[in-house]
């Protein structure tokens, strides 16, 4: 089978924040620090656009062998425009663009990958070996603000292997190894110096390398008409993980900071300094209670040990739970209820926040199920959430509190064109780009 695929994806984000000062008082030795402050308006926009081209070929050889090969080309363009406006404290005039301390930045990744795989199936035993080569061309341009343009190239060989055993017609046991590459997203890379809080300054790092993670996984699955169960145990390690690093430094040491005074402030950025070890257990259960009722749950527990090249260490547990129910009603109505939550997540210098959310959706189908109208709402009894985080370093402890809304309300409309027939075969390979490390918004630059 030969498959050609194309996918386009774009993720625009905007931010607009204001920092103003009133009734400022300070000890005598901090008066110079107060004089450098301005009312600020940070107007930012970030965007990532991906074009992916993929070709896959799979062929059986005899009854027990399978060969596969393919290639993928990703054009990933990251862009960020952060404009800084300021005005004198205590005035009501217009904000004026500070072009010197604004930042317009482009980061382009061209990724070319090719893979080969071999599969074997003998009675109840199956196995697979694979290898993938990736070449990454990275180009960084500073269109406005401080920074030197540069280019970097990476070459990686990514192996994988797995073996499975068919316990029964409905259950399987599988063990596998794979290496994964996680490239930093725009929030990690954005070099904009965010000093809207002059005592807690943050900035991304455009010189970050990709993470390389190695993982071993043992899984058990069982599928019946009533129950679907999947259990897995996993161990992974990374020797160059991207971690947020917060230090207490004199503001004169921060390159590009406007009017430094020599006072000590907190400075956060990202570095490839981390060594992480993760052991996890997870389980998924789906119960078809009746022909119209489905109940499902997903549980995940993870123990993490982290160590930085600067001597920092941290470890701890993190738990995540997701569950819900779906009920089909007469006249093509369907209702779904979901709940999910997580305990505080572990960082190199502290821990993040826990959360608990819930959501409800209602769907109605028309025109022989061609047209579907949906309405959804999440956290409708809780308008605001107040996440916290804690960071510790040499000579300081930082506790952060935020408050924002997590309520979501929406509607959607979908219409199916054409007929769904059993003779229409689904592609064996589809495009999945999961190589970008998520997160990074808290400590990086780019507005708030």
Please provide the spans of the model-predicted regions.
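Repeated loop/turn-to-beta-strand initiation elements of outer-membrane beta-barrel proteins
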Residues: 1-2, 64-67, 124-127, 170-173, ...
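Transmembrane beta-strands of outer-membrane beta-barrel pores
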Residues: 8-14, 59, 73-77, 122-124, ...
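Surface-exposed extracellular loop regions of Gram-negative outer-membrane beta-barrel proteins
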Residues: 18-20, 39, 50, 109-148, 169-214, 235-262, 378-394, ...
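Outer membrane beta-barrel strand-and-loop segments of large Gram-negative receptors
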Residues: 41, 50-54, 96-102, 205, ...
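Residues on the lipid-exposed face of transmembrane beta-strands in outer-membrane beta-barrel proteins
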Residues: 53-59, 114-120, 161-165, 218-222, ...
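Conserved C-terminal beta-signal and adjacent last beta-strands/turns
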Residues: 314-448
């Amino acid at each position: 089978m030969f498959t050609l695929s194309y996918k386009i994806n774009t993720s625009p984000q905007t931010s607009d924040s204001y920092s103003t000062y009133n009734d400022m008082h300070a000890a005598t030795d901090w008066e110079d620090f107060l004089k450098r402050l301005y009312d600020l308006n940070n107007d930012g926009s970030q965007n990532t656009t991906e074009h992916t081209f993929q070709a896959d070929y799979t062929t059986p050889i005899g009854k027990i062998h399978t060969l596969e090969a393919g290639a993928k080309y990703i054009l990933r363009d990251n862009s960020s425009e952060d404009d800084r406006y300021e005005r004198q404290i205590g005035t009501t005039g217009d904000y004026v663009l500070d072009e010197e301390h604004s930042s317009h930045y482009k980061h382009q990744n061209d990724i070319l990958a090719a893979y080969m795989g071999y599969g074997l199936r003998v009675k109840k035993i199956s196995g697979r070996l694979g290898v993938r080569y990736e070449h990454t061309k990275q180009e960084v341009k500073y269109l406005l603000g401080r920074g030197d343009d540069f280019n970097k190239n990476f070459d990686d060989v990514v192996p994988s292997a797995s073996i499975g055993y068919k316990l029964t017609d409905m259950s399987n046991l599988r063990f596998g190894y794979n290496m994964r590459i996680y490239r930093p997203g725009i929030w990690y890379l954005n070099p904009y110096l965010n000093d809207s809080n002059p005592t807690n300054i943050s900035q991304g790092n455009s010189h970050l390398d990709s993470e390389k993670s190695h993982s071993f996984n043992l899984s058990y699955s069982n599928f019946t008409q009533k129950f679907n169960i999947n259990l897995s145990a996993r161990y992974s390690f990374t020797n160059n993980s991207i971690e947020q690093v917060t230090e207490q430094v004199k503001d004169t040491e921060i390159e590009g900071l406007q009017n430094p005074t020599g006072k000590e402030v907190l400075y956060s950025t990202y570095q490839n300094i981390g060594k992480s070890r993760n052991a996890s257990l997870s389980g998924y259960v789906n119960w078809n209670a009746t022909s119209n009722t489905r109940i499902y749950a997903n549980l995940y527990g993870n123990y993490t040990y982290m160590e930085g090249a600067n001597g920092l260490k941290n470890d701890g547990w993190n738990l995540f739970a997701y569950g819900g129910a779906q009920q089909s009603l007469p006249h093509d109505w369907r209702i779904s209820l979901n709940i999910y939550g997580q305990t505080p997540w572990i960082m190199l210098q502290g821990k993040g926040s826990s959360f608990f959310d819930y959501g409800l959706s209602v769907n109605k189908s028309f025109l022989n199920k061609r047209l579907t109208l949906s309405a959804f709402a999440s956290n409708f009894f809780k308008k605001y959430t107040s996440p916290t985080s804690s960071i510790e370093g040499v000579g300081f402890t930082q506790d952060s509190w935020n408050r924002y809304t997590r309520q979501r309300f929406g509607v959607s409309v979908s219409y199916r064109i054409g007929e769904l027939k059993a003779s229409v075969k689904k592609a064996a390979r589809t495009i999945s780009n999961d190589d970008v490390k998520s997160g990074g918004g808290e400590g990086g630059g780019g507005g708030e």
